[in-house]
């Protein structure tokens, strides 16, 4: 804990321990102490991830009276005109990775990308939440690979990932490429100057 002496804890509003562990590792690179806050916050339906994250961060900051950040991400598949995009969580819960593979079964073009939006809000300030984005290009592979990670990780292979799906990578490896890690690093660099 001495690494983080005199640093303000920032609270990550999520119920997803996998997301939290990824975020904690990235923010630790910047010596930013992070705590998980499992809090129900508003998640609007919108085609824009930044709007979703911004609304959730504002609501969570008001409810908790703490400086918080939220992260929302989506998988955008080019052959499906960007579907599932901001609805990725719902689609994953209803169709899963096998459903996505079935939909893409006869598609030759399997290009896709993950997009992440991180939003920070401090209830002591009247300003709009600050947002940060990360994006990783890749493709949907033809069958699930690996046992690490969560969500769409077994079917997404990032560009430059040496032919590995996210689910075949350790958290440290995944954080070299991931959309979430990119957005979190942008947030961390900004947050260092903020505190």
Spans of features found by a protein language model:
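Anionic-ligand binding patches
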Residues: 2-11, 18-195
